[in-house]
Amino acid sequence: MSTMHVEVVSAEAQIYSGEAEFLVAPGEMGELGVYPRHVPLLTRIKPGPLRIRVPGQAEEVIVAVSGGLMEVQPDAITVLADVAVRGDEIDEARAEAAKKAAEAALEKATDDRETAAARQALKTAIAELKALDYLRRRVH
């Protein structure tokens, strides 16, 4: 099977760089599956799990993204995520606590800046929890 190069980066770090046979991203209108030689595309992605099928590996690489942009070219995909964390690095207790803290901050927000920051923190926590949920369902 042919492959494409995938880059997933956040503002803080490069999260994934390598070849992939297939990628599924949480698109604005639902999941978006991309194979090599896909037509060029630029789209927004929403919070959720990004799934990358790596050649020669039985398990997909899972990355929680809190939103961002994805550029698709026939032989490459670049995901520019607001925040991204590899699924195997997510701490469930921390993500649950972050979600509760963000919900509380959203309720207490007094201006647009505080509201935007709380919404971004909530998106990040929800994306991590969705990725963990996907990983659990995949195992069972």
From Swiss-Prot:
Main location: membrane
Protein name from the UniProt record: ATP synthase epsilon chain
Assigned protein family: Belongs to the ATPase epsilon chain family.
One GO cellular component term: plasma membrane
Function: Produces ATP from ADP in the presence of a proton gradient across the membrane.
Membrane topology: Peripheral membrane protein
Quaternary state and interactors: F-type ATPases have 2 components, CF(1) - the catalytic core - and CF(0) - the membrane proton channel. CF(1) has five subunits: alpha(3), beta(3), gamma(1), delta(1), epsilon(1). CF(0) has three main subunits: a, b and c.
One Gene Ontology molecular-function label: proton-transporting ATP synthase activity, rotational mechanism
Subcellular location: Cell inner membrane
Record NCBIfam families: ATP_synt_epsi, PRK00571.1-4
Lineage: Bacteria, Pseudomonadati, Pseudomonadota, Betaproteobacteria, Neisseriales
Keywords, sorted A to Z: ATP synthesis, Cell inner membrane, Cell membrane, CF(1), Hydrogen ion transport, Ion transport, Membrane, Transport
